[in-house]
From Swiss-Prot:
Chain positions found as N6-succinyllysine: 278
Keywords (A to Z) from UniProt: ATP-binding, Kinase, Mitochondrion, Nucleotide-binding, Transferase, Transit peptide
EC number: 2.7.11.2
Function: Inhibits pyruvate dehydrogenase activity by phosphorylation of the E1 subunit PDHA1, and thereby regulates glucose metabolism and aerobic respiration. Can also phosphorylate PDHA2. Decreases glucose utilization and increases fat metabolism in response to prolonged fasting, and as adaptation to a high-fat diet. Plays a role in glucose homeostasis and in maintaining normal blood glucose levels in function of nutrient levels and under starvation. Plays a role in the generation of reactive oxygen species.
Protein name, per record: [Pyruvate dehydrogenase (acetyl-transferring)] kinase isozyme 3, mitochondrial
């Protein structure tokens, strides 16, 4: 423990600096699948992870130190840093240990499980730090931009880190889910999209009914351009897709119920369209919940703009549909992680269409990973420049006063 605290106090421990010089190695869903299905070898996985996991940790740990000091000094942020440092040091112990020793493989597996459990609360803990910072120091556009940039990369790194750990522990830990025997780790080779849609809807519906006592119905339509009249399937991580869909259904239900609660005709259904083309698998969720003004769309994905109240520390007092306001930005990161995206199209006064885009081919679904390099460093160090587009002032200029002022200047020059 003395070594741990000594390293934590150093500006940049040498091992972190060394590993951060390497770029992460992005894998495709097909590579995950092929390894787990055809030639799953625990020794090979161990040899890869004992290098790759420290590289991914080191890249994000170097970037953390570029955040404003006032944010780094928040207790919650310090706690997250300590978790990352501890996990990094535990992984370093296996840097040179031979995979031929079965005890090494068993111990490494247990270390990965402990690390995963330790990092379970990284998102809410870091969110707490951002809230503490915002409450004490207010909102600054430049710092907010840097925090947005960092958190997108930080949380993406966390998604990828857990993906690697989950694949190893599920393949070699003997904790395969009997309900999904065909899964390769956390990947479903034949993920039925409509089934995940319905599961996410039912979970969101349960919460909506628990809080509002009612919930809109669901209408699902499929259009398979590759194989007409057949169910749409994709090689994907069902838990990732569920996370995105649940968040979107939750938002649609809340908006729909609150807008139509006093209307006699009831609640309009939430409609879902699933389509599969040559390149993209798209899922559109449409509601009639009143929509959002265009100027607010970007704010829905901004960590610093969240209008959600600070969540209660007592679970019994927390509203089921409340949180840190991170649901949409994190969901978009899940979509982008394997080269997809999540977009919102809203018509104020009517409703919102939320579209999830995924790659149709697993060979094109490569991890999208943040890399710590000079470009990333410059993003934090570059000072904001003047806007090169006009900005409307808060009050329109009175042309008559301006003209009178110019006439007075001219008359003074005459004398």
């Amino acid at each position: 423990m003395r070594l741990f605290y000594r390293l934590l106090k150093q500006p940049v421990p040498k091992q972190i600096e060394r590993y951060s010089r390497f770029s992460p190695s992005p894998l495709s869903i097909k590579q995950f699948l092929d390894f787990g299905r055809d030639n799953a070898c625990e020794k090979t996985s161990y040899m890869f992870l004992r290098k790759e996991l420290p590289v991914r940790l080191a890249n994000t740990m170097r970037e953390v130190n570029l955040l404003p000091d006032n944010l780094l000094n928040r207790p919650s942020v310090g706690l997250v840093q300590s978790w990352y440092m501890q996990s990094f040091l535990e992984l370093l112990e296996y840097e040179n240990k031979s995979p031929e020793d079965p005890r090494v493989l068993d111990n490494f597996l247990n270390v990965l499980i402990n690390i995963r459990n330790r990092h379970n609360d990284v998102v809410p803990t870091m969110a707490q730090g951002v809230i503490e910072y915002k409450e004490k120091f207010g909102f600054d556009p430049f710092i907010s931009s840097n925090i947005q940039y960092f958190l997108d990369r930080f949380y993406t790194n966390r998604i990828s880190f857990r993906m690697l750990i989950n694949q190893h522990t599920l393949l070699f830990g003997g904790d395969t889910n009997p309900a999904h025997p065909k899964h390769i780790g956390s990947i479903d080779p034949t993920c039925n999209v409509a089934d995940v849609v319905k599961d996410a809807y039912e979970t969101a519906k349960m919460l909506c009914e628990q809080y509002y006592l009612v919930a809109p119905e669901l209408e699902v339509e499929e259009f398979n351009a590759k194989a007409p009249n057949k169910p749409i399937q994709v090689v994907y991580v069902p838990s990732h897709l569920f996370h995105m869909l649940f968040e979107l259904f939750k938002n649609s239900m809340r908006a729909t119920v609150e807008l139509h609660e006093d209307k006699k005709e009831g609640y309009p259904a939430v409609k879902t369209l699933v389509t599969l083309g040559k390149e993209d698998l798209s899922i559109k969720i449409s509601d009639l919940g009143g929509g959002v003004p265009l100027r607010k769309i970007d704010r829905l994905f901004n960590y610093m703009y969240s209008t959600a109240p600070r969540p209660s520390l007592e679970p019994t007092r927390a509203a089921p549909l409340a949180g840190f306001g991170y649901g949409l930005p994190i969901s978009r990161l899940y979509a982008r992680y394997f080269q997809g995206d999540l977009k919102l199209y809203s018509m104020e006064g009517v409703g919102t269409d939320a579209v999830i885009y995924l790659k149709a081919l697993s060979s094109e679904s490569f991890e999208r990973l943040p890399v710590f390099n000079k470009s990333a460093w410059r993003h934090y160090k570059t000072t904001p420049e003047a806007d090169d587009w006009s900005n409307p002032s808060s009050e329109p200029r009175d042309a008559s006063k301006y003209k009178a002022k110019q006439d007075k200047i001219k008359s003074n020059r005459t004398f």
